[in-house]
């Protein structure tokens, strides 16, 4: 008997709820704001927000300020890497050779990882480079460069400060020199060894 009354009470509440007027249904529907579909063009959406001439202000491991704007007039290679990244370690000698052998090219290495400066110094004793290194946090990367989708990731900056090309994955000195020539920069003269060779 109690079960029957409980069933009647539940059905009665359901009928009453269904009979009430829904004022929200009478109101005109709001038009939702268009939401960009990141799957349609994820790279394009991110690139559109990036400036043509990115700024980069970091402090190197040596404690020196490094500002991309102060390197105008040179081709600058901005290389995101990490100590744990094997392909990053493989390209470091080529980037060092490029920085040493080509007066018109400068390289900055951005260690994109959570690592203490002392630990980075120990790493660089085993894997030395000829260019400055700065540690940047993975939670606060430079705003004018898109967050790397993988490591290593390298940007080639033209002497006027604009971005000539981006490389995802390991890059060889010859690829950078070819990209410089394609962008109107100096070609490697015949008979001169390629940096990193």
Language model segments and positions:
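Thiol/disulfide oxidoreductase modules built on the thioredoxin-like
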Residues: 122-130, 135-182, 191
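Sec-dependent bacterial lipoprotein signal peptides
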Residues: 1-17
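Short, low-complexity, Pro/Ser/Thr/Gly-rich segments in the mature regions of secreted, periplasmic
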Residues: 183-197
């Amino acid at each position: 008997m109690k079960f029957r009354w409980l069933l009647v009470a539940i059905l009665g509440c359901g009928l009453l709820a269904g009979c009430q007027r829904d004022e929200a249904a009478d109101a005109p529907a709001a038009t939702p704001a268009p939401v960009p579909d990141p799957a349609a063009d994820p790279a394009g959406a991110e690139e559109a927000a990036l400036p043509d001439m990115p700024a980069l202000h970091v402090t190197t491991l040596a404690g020196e300020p490094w500002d991309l704007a102060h390197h105008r007039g040179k081709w600058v290679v901005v290389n995101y890497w990490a100590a744990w990244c094997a392909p990053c370690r493989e390209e470091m000698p080529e980037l060092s050779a490029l920085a040493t052998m080509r007066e018109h090219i400068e390289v900055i290495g951005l260690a994109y990882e959570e690592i203490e400066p002392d630990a980075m110094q120990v790493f660089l004793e085993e894997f030395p480079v000829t260019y400055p290194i700065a540690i940047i946090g993975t939670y606060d990367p430079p705003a004018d460069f898109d967050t790397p989708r993988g490591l290593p990731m390298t940007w080639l900056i033209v002497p006027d400060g604009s971005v000539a090309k981006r490389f995802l994955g390991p890059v060889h000195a010859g690829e950078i020199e070819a990209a410089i020539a394609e962008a109107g920069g100096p070609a490697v003269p015949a008979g001169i060894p390629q940096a990193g060779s």
